[in-house]
A protein has these predicted regions:
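Generic serine detector
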Residues: 12, 25, 50-53, 91, ...
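Catalytic cores of PAPS-dependent sulfotransferases
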Residues: 37-50, 64-68, 92
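Non-heme Fe(II)/2-oxoglutarate
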Residues: 1-41, 47
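Short, conserved, surface-exposed binding loops centered on an aromatic residue
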Residues: 34, 47-53, 75-80, 94
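Short coil/loop residues immediately preceding or within conserved phosphate-binding loops
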Residues: 56
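Generic ordered-secondary-structure signal
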Residues: 1-10, 44, 53, 94, ...
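Catalytic core of Fe(II)/2-oxoglutarate
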Residues: 59-154
Length: 154
């Protein structure tokens, strides 16, 4: 199906849904979502993004295993009010030949920029912007882990 239409294959843990439905309350990652929505952090997001309309953050935990990917898309969601997308990379010692790279595309679909998912790095970009995560190679020795989210305005 991916040859003819937008597709993705990766594992996710939806932090906002988990918080609303009280899943796994003991997981430390729930504290991260709370932090990403504190007034000081939202002020930081507004400052960094030069966007006073940012009101909150939505996030998910993502894991890309060998053979998984995210096809080109723009993260546009009018109902959520996405302003910026963010990726907090959590994979140690990631190698370029393992794939899983965040790539930005121009209007013709050509790659114009590529970012390796380096440990403890933040990728932040304005939405909409065409991008993809390349296929994680079958020989990748570990999954690609990240916290992926959006700065929202409502």
């Amino acid at each position: 199906r991916a040859a003819n239409a937008y597709q993705f294959a990766y594992d996710s843990y939806m932090l906002v849904k988990a918080a609303k439905e009280a899943w796994d309350s003991g997981l430390l990652v729930h504290g991260l979502l709370q932090f990403l929505n504190t007034p000081p952090y939202i002020e930081f997001a507004r400052y960094l993004g030069s966007d006073a309309s940012i009101t909150h953050t939505a996030a998910q935990c993502t894991r890309y295993r060998p053979g998984q990917y995210l096809m080109p898309h723009e993260d546009l969601d009018e109902n959520e009010g996405r302003r910026y997308a963010m990726v907090i990379n959590l994979s140690r010692d990631w190698r370029p030949d393992w794939g899983g790279q965040l790539q930005f595309l121009d209007g013709d679909g050509s790659v114009v920029e590529t970012f390796l998912p380096r440990w403890n790095s933040l990728s932040l970009f304005r939405v909409p912007q065409r991008h993809q995560v390349t296929l994680v190679a079958p020989w990748a020795a570990q999954p690609r882990h990240a916290i992926t989210g959006w700065w929202l305005a409502r």
